[in-house]
């Protein structure tokens, strides 16, 4: 009888010692950290966006790829600083990354591949400054039409 209790406790203790499955947000953090450990990376990169965005309904096991965008920060890559406290570098590099999700024994094995982003994070021209130009052009056209019609 004692051996049954010992066996039961050993099984329960072993089950409790198993690592918790990796969540989507944790996998993204692990992928960014993996990229930052590369020898060619001087300044650390931080997560800019992910597709899909992290949320309670996103399960890592349902994804085939992690797709995310990272941006260069002002912190050194191997300084040990918390990435959340690092500010993005003005005109810093932006990279689009992908990592196939391979689950082995409840752990994710990530092979991160990043390329320079084609999206330019600098300011874009806005529509509103062009409105006065358009109004003046239309008004000049109307005045020209009226002048021609009078003749």
UniProtKB/Swiss-Prot annotation:
Query: What is the residue range of the signal peptide feature?
Result: 1-17
The molecular function GO annotations come to: lipopolysaccharide binding; membrane destabilizing activity
Entry GO CC? extracellular space; membrane
Record membrane topology: Single-pass membrane protein
Query: SUPFAM superfamilies this protein is in?
Result: Cystatin/monellin (SSF54403)
The superkingdom of the source organism is: Eukaryota
Q: List the disulfide bonds.
A: 75-86, 97-114
The free-text tissue note of the record is: Detected in bone marrow, liver and lung.
Alphabetical list of Pfam families matching this protein: Cathelicidins
Q: Which GO terms describe its biological process?
A: antimicrobial humoral immune response mediated by antimicrobial peptide; defense response to Gram-negative bacterium; defense response to Gram-positive bacterium; innate immune response
Q: Where in the cell is the protein located?
A: Secreted; Membrane
Sum up the protein's function in the record's words: May bind bacterial lipopolysaccharide (LPS). May have antimicrobial activity and play a role in the innate immune response.
Q: What is the official name of this protein in its record?
A: Cathelicidin-3
Q: Which organism is it from?
A: Gallus gallus (Chicken)
